[in-house]
Structure formats: structure tokens, C-alpha cells
């Protein structure tokens, strides 16, 4: 039997129901929602149901805030009560470090528009008098948080979806996803029932990995056994109790029918179902694991002593889909039309409303309405095909869920996977490695530490994962030269007869330039937002190389392939084919020329040019570009020649004072030079004009590039806000992102990125401010861990404003 549907959603949990609800509200009626059992019978029915809105990113916080707004009005719309209890939330602090975390959260709350308050222990007790205040030094209170009944919410959303024309079919087990030519063509049910469709949404919860495999898509979710207990009614418990979290004890609480729910995130988590989930696992729980729950039980009884005598109704133990980085997995995969909405890390109830709206936008409009990068499925590289790798990373995420996560903190799990050719040399030089997209990358070198630079140590948390080697490497590069291993940079080749025309349509800059030219450009979405930014080098008439950030390779590849017109254009990922070393500084030319017979003079090899050269015995592609604001080159040899190139340059550079340097020095130098970071300073929600990148937009290149019409409208109106460079009065007060900025007592913006500029002697922060406040000299304040730091808008770039050094 065959039938047709415009979109098929697989998974009748709260996410699937929300997506169906929001699709019909966008006018799509031919929506089919399938579930292998009954609605909510996977993970939704056993969720604890807590709703906390404040998250680490603006997008996720906005999604949660939208969800609360939806839950408030859903009963009136659908005539079904979602069980929303807007009782507020309390988060306790039992240490000064935890109190610092709450102060930081308070700043984020101001930035995101949430009424988060820092309150005293006594004020917290007034709201939840059953907790023992011993050791508690304060709390954060958010009155608009709460909790709801997961099943009631799902049924209300499903009712709203049905009212809009959606069909819901239970007992429908998906056994196949049909694809052809890299896109979805249909869904197979049971033995041979087929549904023809061009769009499938995998909202399969703990089955999302298995469903993804049917389409050849890796969805790295790991089912984790999550436990909480439920008590009978307790004396003193009131319905209006706020939810309570004590992260230092790893536990959370909420009221339930006069009793309490108490759960948490243990240090020794248990995964489940990795060898396959039983086919009859519908509306079922796992057996309670009291030995594993005991540390949480002890913490819960310590904080709420009345639990010691409470009658326990049950210990709920249910699998929840977690991800290797603790973020949702959303968006369209490499298989066109196959969307994923999974891996909600026990926050699917809180996120359901926002997930439904975002996914509906993505499906209907072809793009999400917000910057969804941190949740985009394209953030996961091919190494996540390994279940062992995903499992190890996910275990770490779960076990450290309630830990304080300090700025620039590095993950420890599943390290040492992707190594550059020079890795042994970096290790021998005392590299302090960080990890990005599986690559080991030097943040700094312990061999460069210098005590006299201790005066630069940032105040508070920003000084935790910091070293005097960072300013040493920065200053040495500015004064002499630094050698940087950038092998992890993603490299993409676009080739074929139609390559140039294709890139002209995708890029806002003019890339149809002579062979050997390097162009900085963005790729925009239909609204003029920046989807990608990178350099494009023309290697031949029909061959171009794109170099983009380590973490953005799969994202940018996905965007390019999504718009690839036909077989006249070939797109290849060359990241693992070539190493990359960056050599920068005033001595860079002398060092490189000493080991190359090629003419590297300014007249022969100008800025933003590229050509093949030989360095010692190593042939490589040399790009005269910079991300640090200094004379120099990026050198791209074949991967197997990378270590020889490193050795050649280090030996040649010794008489010139060359030092190995890391990514933290790069970041401080790019701040001084005003170079933007995609995903922070520029995103799909920001356009080149307000970001100060209008110089790279070529309206007159004779091509209607994607986003051009939207940018032309913005040009005629003029930017309402601008990305501004702020200098804080105190060079040890470092803003790292999301801190609020105020002028005359009013919140006017938030920090996108920040750090220290050691050459200019300042703490630097970037923030979007209203256009009327963007004039250099304007005074503002930036809140850094609860203290308002004076700052001023400055003309950028702070370092080498005329660009003389990079063109020398």
C-alpha cells in the first residue's frame, strides 16, 4: 500500500507533536505524525518536567522563553490543559565559586531579558521552607520558570496539530527510509507499506540513532538511564513551591501531588540500549538502580531532611537521549529533506515549544529563524560515526552536568583522536592542548611561560585557564615571528566548469578574479545573515579552495552542497589531505626566504595572493593572508610533509627569534585587529553591514547573490545597530561573551566576544550597540561577574589601523 504526505514526522513524543503543531500553524495541512507505540510512550512520559529558561546561548534561551509563552496559552487554544505550573525556580549556591556562577547567570539574564534575581538564603527559604540552609550562601530566583506534565503537554500539542489538519498514526513502526540522489523519497512501514514524501523529520528520541542509520545519517545520541524518586504527600509541601536545584549536591526537586520529585545527575552514569532497543520497549521503564542512585539520595536528604522519613512511591528509571556535547541536535542533514530533532538531554519538555517553532521555520522557509549553529547537526564530523567516541563524550557530559564550567575549559574525554603531523614536536615543546572537532590544537606552550607577564592575569574566572605564555607568544609574534600549527583548519575544494558562477551566486564578495587571488567573503542566507565566512583562493580557472574554521567545516560544506546546482560543480573536503602552518611577524619574510628559492619580496608576492612555492624540500601552496594582523603566510603542504615543514621553519627561524605559538595568542591578536569570529561576532542573525564587513560586499558584481535583495533593503534603511569595539578601563576585567552592556542605566547590548590585547594594553570586548551609541568615545559599562566595569567605544582596529604591517 502506498500513500503520500508532504512531511512525515517520526516520533510521537513531545518534540514530534510540537513540530506537527507548528507546521500546521504555518499553513501545512498534509502533515503525518507516526509513532511506533502510543503518543509519549518513548521518553516523554517519564520526564520530570522541569522548565528552566536561562541557558548558555541566546538562541536556546529565546526558545525556552517562547515555550513558556506557548504553555501559558495552550489550554485556551486547544481546550486541553498542558499542566503548566509557573511557580518559579531556585538555584542554590553552597560555595563562593557557585555564587560567582550565579552572578554570571544574572548578567546573562539581563542580556536575555529574563527577570533573574540574586537573593539571600533567607529569601530562598521563604519560597521553599523545607530545604536545610546549612552551607547555602545565596540563590538565584527566576519567577517565570516552572514545571509541567509531559504527557498533558504532548496531548495538548497533538490536539492543536489535529485541529490544523495533521494526521497522527500510532502503532506505526518505521522499517526503512527511502533515498535517491542524496535526498529523501519515502518512508517504509512494517513489511511493505510505503509513504511517499520529500521531507522526513527524525524526532525519534532514544531511537533517533537507529532511525538516522536507515537514511545513512549519523545521529550521535546515547540513551542514558536517568533516575528520580517520587514521594507520597509530605507535611509542609505546597503546590506553589518553586522548583529547586542544588548543583553542588547534584540534585533537583519539584512538588508533585503534595509530595516531592527528587532527582539529579550522578557521577557514574549508565548508558543503555547501545546494542539495540527492544522492539516492544513502549511505555516502559528500566528497573530502578538504587545503588547508583544512592549518592543522589544522600544529597537530596541532606538538602531536604524531611525526605529521610518520606514514603517513596517509586524510583523512576527511564532512558533519555543525550548528546556528546550536551546540546540539542536539530536541522537538515546531508541527506536533503531528512531533518533531525533529537538529543534533548532531559530538557525536551522545556525545549519542546521552541524546538517545534524552530524546526517548522527550517522546514517551511529552508532556514531557521534564529542562529541555530550550536544545535545544528552539521557540527558533528565523521568521527562521531564511532559509537565508542560518542559514548565516552556523552558520559562525560552527563557526569559533569552540574559542574561549574569555567571559561576556556577543555573537555577531557576521548582526546587524542585527530593529530597534526607536527604533533610530536608540539608535545615536546610543552604544548597545552585544546580540542576542537576532534583535533588536538596547541592553546599555548608551557616552554614560553614568563613570570614577568603575570600582571596580565585576568581577574576571577577568566584567569583560571590562562598562562603567561599567551602574552609572551602574542608579543613575540608582534616583535619577531610566531609559528602556528593550523592543520585543523577545514579545507574545501570547489571545482568544475560551473564552479566560478556557483561561488559568485553564493558569495557576497567578487570571487571571479585572476588565478592566484585570495578573497575574504561571506555566504549569506536569504535574510542577509552571515551563514559562513572564509577565504576563497582561485587556483585555476575552474578550481577554488575555501579555508574555514576548524569547527565549521561540516557546516560550511553542508551549506555549499545544499545549493550546489548540478554535476558541473564538484565539492570535496580536503581537510585531511593538507597540513597548514601559519608563519607571521615582522621577521616572517626573512625566515621564509632563507629556506626558499622563490621570490617572496613584496613586489613579487603581494598581500592576498597565493602561489606554489618550495620551502626547504617541501612543496606547498602559500597564501599571503593573516588572521593576526602581521606580515606572513599560511603554508599548505601535503599532510605527510607537514612535520618536515615544521622542522625546516623552526630551524630557519631560530636566529630570528621565532617561537612556537598557540591559538590563544591568535585570538588576542585578532581582537586587536578587529577580525570577526563566526558564531560569536557574526552569525546567521547578523548582516555584513552592521558587522562592519560592508567592504566585502560587492553589490555591483553583476550577480544576484543569495541575500543581496535583503542587504539592499538594509542599505537603504541604514543599520539600526553596529558591532562596536569596547575598551574596558581595567585591563584585568575580561568579558568573555553574553555579558550585558548598559548606557545611562539601560541595557543596550551584549558582549559577543572579548579578551586582552597585549600590544595595545587593554581589555577588549565586542558588542552590538544601537547606532546612536556607536560613535567612538561613547561611554558604556560592561557587567563582569556582577561588577559594572567602565568602558568606551573606540575606533577600530586598535592595532595597525592602516594595515601597513600586513602589506609590508
Residue ranges and their predicted role:
Residues 24-44:
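Glycine-rich FAD pyrophosphate-binding loop
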